[in-house]
Amino acid sequence: LVGSEMCIRDRYKVLNLFIAGVGTVGGNLLEQIRIQQPKLMRQNGLKLNVVGISNSKKALLCREGINLDNYLEELKENGEESNPEHLCEEIVKMNIFNSVFVDCTASPDVAALYETLMNNNVSVVAANKEAASSSYDNYTKLKETARHRDIKFLFETNVGAGLPIINTMNDLINSGDHILKLEAVLSGTLNYIFNTISADIPFSEAIHMAKEAGYAEPDPRIDLSGKDVIRKLVILAREAGYPVEQADVKRNLFIPEKYFEGSLEDFWKNIKDTDAGFEEKRQLLEAEGKRFRFVAKMENGACEVGLQAVDSHHPFYELEGSNN
């Protein structure tokens, strides 16, 4: 086995991947790896060896690599009962050279594993926003651990999905620039809702449509609260060099606090009460040639999020659908 591993390493650079989460994000990543693997090996001399796949209940681990043609079936039938702590212990015990933990979950329990993994020389790549938007002390500790261990802690997809926003910011800072101000639309869900509202589609119906289209969370109050936007803004501000906490961000809610209280059923029943007010505002904006945008701003470390009216001269005006 050792001889076989050395032979592969001689021919290719091998990255051994542990992938947590097999939902939309993790499933698409695994499919992309499966399709691109021959090309990566042929053109880049890179072998992505998926040695671990886990969901919230089971983990499938194999140091020789997992067949990605039927990994869901394998995970279901042959995966071990597992939880985040058990998964972390098994990864550390496997002690595989050049390994990367890829977090495709949204779980704070999984994010809590990063420090232990990194202290055992496992790099971390996270789609999960929990760690990078957690306390500033935890954020800096993880960054410092990665530097000290000469491994990676990457979270590019935390903001902007596939757009290289964080990497571009890092390049600017490393070349001597200072980022003084940021302004962005960071929620595809909210942008979809405000682009959908019309004389025929009230605010409450637009929220329903966002949920049905798969943009909104099962509990859309998470999106409407701006919490996800706040986390993204905090991450960007920190990467720009400012020691920002989530509690530091000024929130200008466009829905009264009372709608975030009670059950989800209460929310759906009561949110219709806001339709008339939003339609009145929409008509006024339409007459002025303006549109609603939920905007995140950072200036010299001061952060705020809130609803803003923009005219046709503003870069955010033409953002269609769920674009952000």
Language model features with spans:
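Short, small-residue-biased leader/transition segments that mark boundaries at the very start
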Residues: L1-I8
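ATP-dependent carboxylate/acyl-activation modules
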Residues: R9, K13-L15, H313-N324
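N-terminal glycine-/serine-/threonine-rich beta1-alpha1-beta2 phosphate-ribose binding loop
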Residues: R11-N119
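Conserved active-site and cofactor/substrate-binding residues in soluble primary-metabolism enzymes
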Residues: A20, T24, N28, L48, ...
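Rossmann-fold NAD(P)-binding glycine/threonine-rich loop
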Residues: S107-N119, K129-F155, A161, I166-M169
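Rossmann-like NAD(P)H-binding beta-loop-alpha module
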Residues: R147-D150, L154-A213, K227, I235
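Substrate-binding/catalytic subdomain of NAD(P)-dependent oxidoreductase enzymes
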Residues: T196-I197, E205-Y317
